[in-house]
Amino acid sequence: GGLSTAEGLPTSNLPLRGGKGWLYEGGIREPYIIKWPGAAEPGTVCREPVTSTDFYPTMLEIAGLPGRPEQHLDGKSLVPLLRQEGGVDRNTLFWHYPHYSNQGGFPGAAVRKGDFKLLERFEDGKVQLYNLAEDIGERNDLAETMPEKVTELRKLLHDWYLEVDAEFLYPKEEGGAVMPWRPGE
């Protein structure tokens, strides 16, 4: 008995790169399935990017409940999308993983604006830039050929760090001192 993986890995996110614990699309792009009789037609597919923080404000709106003033909502209600009345009033998404994990990902953050996504590694500040419309598998790093786009997205990401008071880590250093890294250092 047992599991044989002679033909390859037991699971795959292809054509997406990475998996759980990674900032690549294979780790953050997931189907979001909602059933709401009378609002969304069965089989409807929406390609607008959303995030898990959108779930809470969506449920509040569906239930007809106001958000509490002391609560800060990072997400946006998806009700206009579900009712096919419009989109979500947002064109930028952020992800922040300031830690090591057992899945092999790296501590870092990402920002997506339109079709472009920038990843920033916290260990060394290295960035990667991808055009997801043309490269869903994130194989062609455009950071060196599009420095103006890197600057634009990196500024958005660093401004967001300050806005949300993002936490950072002390990266592991092989055989040396542990040195902190923060944006702009």
Functional labels for PLM-detected ranges:
Residues 141, 151, 161-162, 172-185:
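Extracellular/periplasmic ectodomains of large secreted or surface enzymes and adhesion receptors
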Residues 3-25, 40-44, 48, 53-132, ...:
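C-terminal cap/loop subdomain of S1 sulfatases and analogous C-terminal strand-loop tails that border
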Residues 32-34:
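Short glycine- and hydrophobic/aromatic-rich loop-to-beta-strand nucleating segment
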Residues 132, 147-150:
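C-terminal structured subdomain/cap of oxidoreductase catalytic cores
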Residues 135:
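Intrinsically disordered, low-complexity polar regions and short flexible loop motifs
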Residues 29:
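Conserved nucleotide-sugar donor-binding catalytic segment
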Residues 89-90, 154-173:
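Bilobed periplasmic-binding protein-like "clamshell/Venus-flytrap" ligand-binding domains
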